[in-house]
Swiss-Prot record:
<dbReference type="InterPro" id="IPR007240">
    <property type="entry name" value="Atg17"/>
</dbReference>
<keyword id="KW-0653">Protein transport</keyword>
<comment type="similarity">
    <text>Belongs to the ATG17 family.</text>
</comment>
<keyword id="KW-0175">Coiled coil</keyword>
<dbReference type="GO" id="GO:0034727">
    <property type="term" value="P:piecemeal microautophagy of the nucleus"/>
</dbReference>
<dbReference type="GO" id="GO:0015031">
    <property type="term" value="P:protein transport"/>
</dbReference>
<dbReference type="Pfam" id="PF04108">
    <property type="entry name" value="ATG17_like"/>
</dbReference>
<feature type="region of interest" description="Disordered">
    <location>
        <begin position="1"/>
        <end position="50"/>
    </location>
</feature>
<feature type="compositionally biased region" description="Polar residues">
    <location>
        <begin position="1"/>
        <end position="11"/>
    </location>
</feature>
<keyword id="KW-0813">Transport</keyword>
<dbReference type="InterPro" id="IPR045326">
    <property type="entry name" value="ATG17-like_dom"/>
</dbReference>
<comment type="function">
    <text>Autophagy-specific protein that functions with ATG13, ATG29, and CIS1/ATG31 in response to autophagy-inducing signals as a scaffold to recruit other ATG proteins to organize pre-autophagosomal structure (PAS) formation. Modulates the timing and magnitude of the autophagy response, such as the size of the sequestering vesicles, through interacting with and regulating ATG1 kinase activity. Plays particularly a role in pexophagy and nucleophagy. With ATG13, is required for ATG1 activation by autophosphorylation. Recruits ATG9 to the pre-autophagosomal structure.</text>
</comment>
<dbReference type="GO" id="GO:0000422">
    <property type="term" value="P:autophagy of mitochondrion"/>
</dbReference>
<dbReference type="GO" id="GO:0030295">
    <property type="term" value="F:protein kinase activator activity"/>
</dbReference>
<feature type="coiled-coil region">
    <location>
        <begin position="324"/>
        <end position="355"/>
    </location>
</feature>
<dbReference type="GO" id="GO:0060090">
    <property type="term" value="F:molecular adaptor activity"/>
</dbReference>
<dbReference type="GO" id="GO:0000045">
    <property type="term" value="P:autophagosome assembly"/>
</dbReference>
Length: 519
């Protein structure tokens, strides 16, 4: 009977959760279903129909039929809702799987990163140890090199006195008489050793870059959380499924209403012809919506429907329900549209979370690959540490050897400067000896000259006294003059030429030698 089938046009559920209730559901009456705990929204109720109620015009019934037919185009929206619900389930499963995999990878990578940081600290300890020795070595180098440079500067500022050099020669310093190439060679060798010691820096920097890049990937990875206050994915999924179920139920109600309209037309005289004509007109102007009124009428005529009224009272009640439900068709269609709009928006949120999870998983795969590359290079970093230690011992020994050479050069140059001062003193001493010898010979010459003068006087007296008595041929030397004596220096081995050294030069040399002896 019609009364038994005219339950309600709108059977939409308000949703599994209060957060997804439909905005129009407040206008509907709610009643409990014995087979479900979910509430029913916006259902139609009707009272017993008066058999004597006024009849409804055929035009009105046909209009209701056409509107009901047009409302069935909501099927595409319901299919889309079902598609979204299925995709949301798959997306939710994917998010859960991706989040679990990304979380597992992240924890493993963080553990490995911690180990890498410990290894890096160990390498840093070796580097710091070498750096401390290196600083001590540099200080020693600066001290020795500074002393050597100071000594060379002193030689550069010390001019060689002209008394030691040929006349007309350009003024020269003590530094001009030594080969500076030895000093430069030692310095270059030390620089090379220092560069060898600093080569470990590059390995540490590369290791730091590897760890920093790995951490950046992890840091840039979107955070995944199961806290529904941040990502209520399960709540959204429930809402989408609830929307889809309600939309399907609403579509069932629309279909039921359409079937009742067809039954009402079919049981009204002249209704079928008018309905077919009006449907054809609508099809010509608005296009085919995929629902054939003729086909439904033929199906109902070949198969007795539960909607078929058995009495006039049943038919009157059916018409009453049709009229009541017809007033709600547009609202039901609008509700389906609004629910689909809400589903599309919620699905975008789920898709965003899916994309975030996918990106997080992709980042973790990238981080895992980077970790593998670091693992391949880790042996090189550890080998670099061992190589650094061995090279440090060798190069340090080489540097200390060069430092000893520089110290020896410094001492040699200092002795060279002191020897020059000693040379000045020696030249002055020799000149003093020459002066003393000359004084002695000058005094001796005076005494000899006096003796010779006395000898000449005695010879003259002798000639005057006895010269006329002695024949000249008795002694050939009787008429000879006195012998002359002259002291002259030997030309060989003469070592002091030119003017004497200035007193200030000699005193300066003595003062410097005195300072050296007091050290």
């Amino acid at each position: 009977m019609a009364s038994s089938s005219a339950t309600s046009l709108r059977q939409g559920s308000s949703g599994a959760s209060s957060g997804h209730s439909h905005p129009q559901s407040t206008s509907l009456s709610r009643h409990s279903n014995s087979n479900s705990n979910s509430s029913r929204s916006r259902s139609f109720t009707h009272q017993d129909v008066d058999p004597n109620a006024p009849s409804i015009s055929i035009d009105t019934l046909v209009n209701h039929l056409l509107v009901a037919k047009r409302s069935l185009s909501s099927m595409t929206l319901v299919l889309r809702a079902n598609e979204i619900a299925n995709a949301a389930r798959q997306s939710h499963e994917d998010v859960a799987i991706l989040a679990a995999q990304a979380g597992f990878l992240k924890e493993s990578i963080l553990d490995q990163t911690t180990i890498l940081v410990r290894v890096r600290r160990s390498l840093q300890g070796t580097y710091d140890w070498g750096k401390r020795d290196f600083k001590k070595l540099i200080r020693s180098m600066d001290l020795v090199d500074g002393g050597l440079e100071q000594t060379m500067e002193m030689l550069r500022d010390t001019s060689v006195e002209g008394v030691f050099r040929p006349e007309g020669e350009e003024r020269r310093s003590l530094l001009d008489f030594i080969d500076e190439g030895g000093v430069h060679g030692v310095r270059e060798a030390m620089k090379k050793s220092i560069q060898e010691l600093q080569s470990f820096d590059g390995d540490l920097l590369r290791f730091d870059t590897d760890i920093r890049n790995l951490r950046k990937i992890i840091t840039d990875t979107p955070a995944l959380t199961h806290d529904d206050t941040h990502f209520p994915t399960f709540e959204l999924l429930e809402g989408l499924v609830d929307h889809s179920a309600n939309m399907a139920q609403l579509l069932v109600s629309l279909t039921h209403h359409f079937d009742m309209c067809v039954t009402a037309i079919r049981t009204t005289e002249g209704g079928v012809a008018l309905a077919r004509r009006r449907a054809a007109e609508v099809t010509q102007t608005q296009g085919n919506d995929g629902v054939s009124i003729s086909g439904v009428i033929a199906e109902q005529e070949s198969n007795v429907s539960d909607l078929e009224p058995n009495t006039a009272k049943d038919r009157a009640e059916m018409l009453k329900v049709v009229v009541q439900d017809a007033g709600e068709v547009n609202d039901v269609v609008q509700e389906i549209q609004e629910r689909l709009t809400a589903m599309e928006q919620d699905y975008l949120v789920l898709q965003e979370q899916h994309d975030i999870s996918k990106q997080a998983y992709s980042n973790m795969l990238e981080a895992y690959a980077v970790l593998g590359e670091i693992g391949d290079r880790l042996a090189d970093y550890l080998a670099a540490e061992g190589d650094f230690k061995s090279r440090w011992d060798m190069e340090k020994e080489s540097v200390f050897s060069k430092l000893q050479e520089m110290q020896q050069l410094k001492e040699f140059y200092e002795r060279y400067a002191s020897a020059y001062d000693s040379l000045i003193i020696e030249v002055e001493r020799r000149r003093a000896v020459d002066d003393k010898v000359k004084n002695i010979w000058r005094k001796a010459q005076d005494s000899v000259d006096k003796l010779l003068d006395a000898d000449r006087a005695s010879r003259e007296t002798f000639r005057q006294d006895v010269g006329e008595y002695l024949p000249t041929d008795l002694w050939a030397g009787m008429q000879g003059s006195a012998k002359k004596w002259t002291v002259v220096p030997d030309g060989e081995g003469e070592d002091v030429k030119g003017p004497a050294l200035r007193r200030s030069v000699v005193e300066g040399a003595r003062e410097r030698l005195g300072r050296v002896e007091r050290r």
